[in-house]
């Protein structure tokens, strides 16, 4: 809609049927099967690369480590190498607010966040040796229509509709929720800046609602929106290890970006 030609790198297992027919018709898909990224980047000839691929796990088991490293470190490194070999220098990537436990400059909430930080260390090498211009967008909790993930808003809405009791933590942890459309707008805006050779915009930014509400407050707001009571059993579950009680709040906002969706927050 903004005049961009879009190419996407997907896995053989990617569910493209989850995309609308209109979207599928406007995107040039390239299937990644390992060791093909240099050829894919050469064929696509991108002006800007946006890197969103990741494996998110709030908590991991030992068996999850290879997949976490492959998705969050190995794939991204191969992508950077492919960009360097094809002289593609503009790069937008997704980080996470969970790299900043208790508001620290760097303290990973979990191994997922640690792999994100590890990738950024690798990116630094390509910035210095291949002349990459990079914008990092630190994401918080996201929501939106058609979300198939079993995230907290979906669970709350499902409980309201079915009437089945939902076992939850005490609910005092705060969340910073941003609609997926607003997240997409941040990526579009960052890409436009880089396409216009705005090197001054390089750096990291928070894609944040600018406010945080407790899970209890979010549930109460959702009840009003749905017109139904949520049968929540508060305190039935303990807080997770390293639960984020207060989201990171000191990140700078990408110039020109502001959220439009304020239904929940």
What are these regions (language model features)?
Residues 1-48:
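N-terminal Rossmann/SDR dinucleotide-binding element
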Residues 32-71, 103:
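NAD(P)H-binding glycine-rich loop region in Rossmannoid oxidoreductase-like domains
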Residues 160-164, 168-265:
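C-terminal substrate-binding subdomain of Rossmann-fold SDR/epimerase-dehydratase oxidoreductases
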Residues 111, 121-175, 180-184, 188, ...:
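NAD(P)-dependent short-chain dehydrogenase/reductase
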Residues 55-57, 95-104, 140-143, 175:
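Active-site segment of SDR-like NAD(P)-dependent oxidoreductases
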Residues 51, 74-111:
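Conserved Rossmann-fold NAD(P)-dependent oxidoreductase catalytic core, especially the SDR/UDP-sugar
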Residues 48, 75-78, 90, 118-119, ...:
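Conserved cofactor-binding/catalytic machinery of classical short-chain dehydrogenase/reductase
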Residues 63, 67-75, 110, 114-115, ...:
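Glycine-rich NAD(P)-binding loop of the Rossmann-fold in SDR/ketoreductase-type enzymes
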